[in-house]
A protein has these predicted regions:
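Helix-loop-helix connectors at the membrane interface of multi-pass transporters/channels
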Residues: 1, 88-93, 127, 160-187, ...
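Transmembrane helix-loop boundary segments of multi-pass membrane transporters
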Residues: 1-4, 17-27, 130-143, 173-185, ...
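Transmembrane alpha-helical segments of multi-pass small-molecule transport proteins
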Residues: 1-15, 29-39, 68-83, 108-109, ...
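Membrane-interface loop-to-helix entry segments
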Residues: 5-42, 101-106, 210-214, 276-284
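Membrane-water interface regions at transmembrane-helix termini and the short interhelical loops
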Residues: 6-27, 85-91, 160-163, 169-174, ...
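Hydrophobic alpha-helical segments and their helix-loop junctions in multi-pass secondary transporters
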Residues: 29-55, 73-77, 118-124, 223-236, ...
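Hydrophobic, membrane-embedded alpha-helices of multi-pass small-molecule transporters
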Residues: 39-44, 55-117, 141-161, 218, ...
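C-terminal membrane-solvent junction of multi-pass transporters and transport-like membrane proteins
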Residues: 221-285, 296-307
Length: 307
């Protein structure tokens, strides 16, 4: 089954963004519809159990909550940082407000639905795997088939866009390979990692720690990008300069590298909140290094520090 899924995802990615776009558009409606139905089934079948469990639970805004949001941001920050991999294919002039609205509508409903369903199912049955609950305990073949379809669509839509496209671009840039060869290589390498083992109950704690760990690096990268774009460049970019290999962006901006290292080191001390902890130190260090480092002089073109 995993081999078939992997082959389908690679084939879809090879066809390029036009095929991915239509697959995503169709699947998102289907997935939201299934999630709404799942929520309805859980609420009607386990309403008394859910009420009994939650009646004695006090909510918390403490470390468990913020650690969970760190894991969430760690997963989605890869997509945030690589948003240009997708937006570069947009042919229409989409304003920031419209783009933000599209991202919000596309991500939040599905994410909240899945989190809510997982929470309710765990509270009612003690099993934290909604897929297993729906496919084995509901006693409905229709619901089992629906659950399996949901898994298939969710895997394909998430993995193709988030996990194949960004590394494929990296391979293309680093080794000068074609898009087709890059996507096939990413697909083969991702299968070698055996991600289906990472989501088992035995691996849950380790996976969460791994997510928090790489958030210690993705948070600083995001901070550098945000400070550079919103504060230093006042949301104005010269695309000709960015794509000119002999232009002002030639070489390595050591101010950014040092800032990312500083932010990563700071976040390691509070691993559960790594993404949040890294933002301010990274942003502050990057701002002052861009202002003072001689080696960053060429990168100041178009910023508030330009001579």
């Amino acid at each position: 089954n995993e081999t078939i899924f992997q082959g389908d995802k690679i084939e879809l990615a090879i066809k390029g963004f036009e095929g991915i776009k239509w697959m995503e558009n169709i699947s998102c409606i289907f997935i939201i519809g299934i999630l709404i139905y799942m929520l309805y089934v859980v609420n009607t079948k386990f309403s008394s159990e859910i009420g009994n469990v939650f009646s004695g639970i006090k909510g918390t805004w403490g470390m468990p909550f913020w650690a969970a949001t760190t894991s969430f941001l760690g997963i989605y920050s890869t997509m945030i940082i690589n948003a240009s991999d997708y937006s570069r294919n947009a042919t229409d002039d989409i304003k920031p407000v419209k783009a933000t609205s599209i991202y919000t509508v596309a991500i939040l409903p599905v994410t909240l639905f899945m989190g809510l369903i997982g929470l309710l199912v765990t509270a009612a049955t003690g099993n934290s795997d909604p897929v297993e609950v729906f496919s084995t305990t509901m006693g409905s073949k229709f619901l089992t088939i629906l659950t399996l379809l949901f898994i298939a669509f969710a895997q394909v839509t998430t993995n193709v866009l988030n996990n194949i496209v960004p590394p494929a671009y990296v391979l293309m840039e680093s080794f000068k390979v074609k898009w087709t060869h890059a996507t096939i290589l990413v697909g083969v390498l991702s299968a070698c990692v055996m991600p289906w083992k990472l989501v088992t109950a035995d691996s849950a704690a380790g996976l969460s720690l791994f997510t928090q760990f790489y958030s210690a690096f993705l948070g600083p990268i995001f901070a550098v990008m945000a400070v550079d774009f919103f504060i230093l460049r006042k949301k104005k970019l010269d695309l000709n300069d960015m794509y000119d290999k002999e232009g002002c962006f030639k070489g390595i901006n050591w101010a950014a590298v040092i800032a990312i290292i500083v932010g990563s080191v700071c976040s390691v001390f509070v691993m559960q909140l790594s993404w949040y902890v890294s933002l301010i130190p990274t942003g502050v260090v990057y701002y002052f290094l861009m202002k003072t480092m001689k080696s960053s002089k060429g990168f100041r073109k178009g910023t508030i520090f330009e001579d």
